[in-house]
Regions:
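Active-site beta-strand termini and strand-to-loop segments that position acidic
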Residues: 264-267
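Active-site micro-motifs of SAM-dependent methyltransferase domains
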Residues: 90, 108, 139
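Helix-to-beta-strand junctions that scaffold the AdoMet/dcAdoMet cofactor pocket
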Residues: 110-111, 124-126
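S-adenosyl-L-methionine-dependent methyltransferase catalytic module, highlighting the catalytic core
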Residues: 114-119, 129-262
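Conserved N-terminal segment of class I S-adenosyl-L-methionine
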Residues: 1-90, 94, 100, 117, ...
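Glycine/Thr-rich phosphate-binding loops of Rossmann-like dinucleotide-binding domains
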Residues: 51-52, 111, 140-141
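A short beta-strand submotif of the Rossmann-like class I SAM-dependent methyltransferase core
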Residues: 103-106
């Protein structure tokens, strides 16, 4: 068996988050890390700060989020150079303030997402990068339980399940890749790179994890921690690591992937 590397992104994420969420974040974190971001970074929708602190440990990062409770958790990390509580459509920064703005699985939760992108462009410097990860329409299409009902001819139940899962995920915009690219271009950004990732076999892990990850939710509600024993001595956690490791090291990029990663630039 592969020896557990407690410094790799997979372990760092699944040892602190529900395994299905940690699995997704570890793959996204790898993409952000591979970009070798330079200078100060704004994390738009930083939440509790877990992803960025694990992914970019040596970067200077400011965080902004509308949820005060999440920002309190982020502050305890002693990682961010600054934290601000604010909505994304009224960013409290001067024009051309940042070279790099990242937003990981955030924009899909915002009803008026175009206003947020407009604000991002305002505070982004010329030549600066806006880097995002968002779900696309493959997320909804590839849900395994919905596909099961469709094969039985139960299309209405399949569609109801898809709506329910988007509601649970708080998705306002599980939109096609082309729609996301269009939103960025409409605000004057140029697409420098983009790809889909998280193919159906990966999405199935995420989907079913919402059921099998229930003990982590109970832990968080009772003790304020998703994982009570985040060490390699935790037998169950170790087995989950060995199970997910081949997926983590495999090719997560896929035209049929449920998420889209985009690197855009302000001209």
């Amino acid at each position: 068996m592969t020896k557990i590397d407690t410094q790799d992104l997979l372990w760092q994420n699944i040892s602190e988050l529900p395994y299905f969420r940690g699995f997704l974040r570890s793959i996204e974190g790898r993409y952000f890390r591979e970009l070798n971001l330079q200078g100060e970074v704004l994390d738009l929708g930083c939440g509790d700060g877990h992803l960025t602190s694990k992914t970019l440990p040596d970067s200077k990062v400011q965080g902004i989020d509308p949820a005060f409770f999440s920002l309190r958790a982020a502050k305890r990390l002693n990682y961010f150079s600054g934290l601000v509580c604010s909505d994304g459509d009224k960013l409290p920064y001067q024009k051309s303030s940042f070279n790099t703005i990242i937003s990981n699985s955030v924009l899909e939760h915002i009803p008026d997402v175009d206003s947020v992108i407009h604000e991002v462009v305002r505070i982004l410097r010329k030549g600066g990068k806006f880097i995002i990860s968002v779900p696309n329409n493959n997320f909804t299409k590839n849900l395994s339980i919905a596909i099961f009902f469709e094969r039985l001819g139960m299309v209405r139940i399949a569609n109801s399940y898809r709506r329910m899962f988007n509601w649970i995920s708080r998705h306002h915009h599980p939109d096609p890749e082309e729609r996301w690219l269009g939103r960025l271009r409409d605000q004057g950004l140029t697409i420098k790179d983009e790809w889909n990732y998280f193919p159906p076999e990966y999405l199935k892990i995420l989907e079913w994890g919402h059921v099998f990850g229930l003990p982590s939710w109970i832990n968080f509600k009772l003790f304020g921690r998703w994982i009570l024993n985040p060490s390699p001595a935790n037998y169950l956690l170790k087995r989950i690591y060995y199970w997910l490791h081949p997926f983590f090291n495999g090719e997560a990029k896929s035209a049929n992937g449920a998420y889209t990663f985009i690197v855009a630039e302000k001209q």
